[in-house]
Amino acid sequence: VTLLLAVALLVAPAPVAGAEVVAQPQAADTPAVRLDLPQLKARLAKAAGGVPDLSNTDLSGLDLAGLDFKAANLTKARLADARMAGANLFSCDLTDAVLTGADLSHANLDGTVLRRAHLDRANLQGASLFATIIEAADLRGADLSGARIIGYLRSANLSGAKLRDANAGADPGNQSMGVMRATFVGADLTGADLTGANLFKADFSHATLASAKLANADLRNAELVQADLTKADVTGAKVSKANLDEADFSGATGVARLVGLGEARNRDKAIFDAN
């Protein structure tokens, strides 16, 4: 319940054995402290119920599969190419973290803050991102196929990302705290693959979906206000009760096969190619 309310309201050198060493920074700020797996586990154990401070640590390339991060502070952490399949990152703060190419398949990212995080080319297949803040994050080329996404992705870059069969649809039976849905307002999904994705009630207002694959996607009740769907494939997509106010379908394929177009809101204000 706490997570639901929070989202509703939010809008290197090799380490020396046994010693923490300073790794070369990836950004022009505080150098990161390189940790090996035993050192990381020691820090997590030392927290003893508190919030582990792993900010500015370098964990790049480590095998962290299944590890419980205990709601750690991982701001500006380096986790590029880390193997984190099935890891528990519940309620962690990964603001400005670097997770380029990381394997986060089936990881628990519920309640996690990933604001401005670098997740380009990351594997998030089957991951859970419920009540997750992913604002302005870099997810270019990331794989979120089959992931559960009820999060805040305003201004995120998902160009070329894979979201095939992703479940980003609102749960009609779990709205006691207000509308809980995936928010892609102003996000860049150019060329993204959302084939068969559940996008029920998702908010794509002002988002760029140019050349995106939306075949058989469920966009019922979705907000597509001023969304750019130029040259997108919308074959078989469900749009009944979706808000199409000034949505641009110019050059889109499969428009004639949209399901429920006659029931869409503001259909007359949408932009379609002339017959």
Label every PLM stretch briefly.
Residues 1-12:
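Bacterial N-terminal signal peptides
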Residues 11, 16-19, 23:
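Boundary at the C-terminal end of the N-terminal hydrophobic targeting segment
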Residues 20-275:
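Tandem repeat scaffolds
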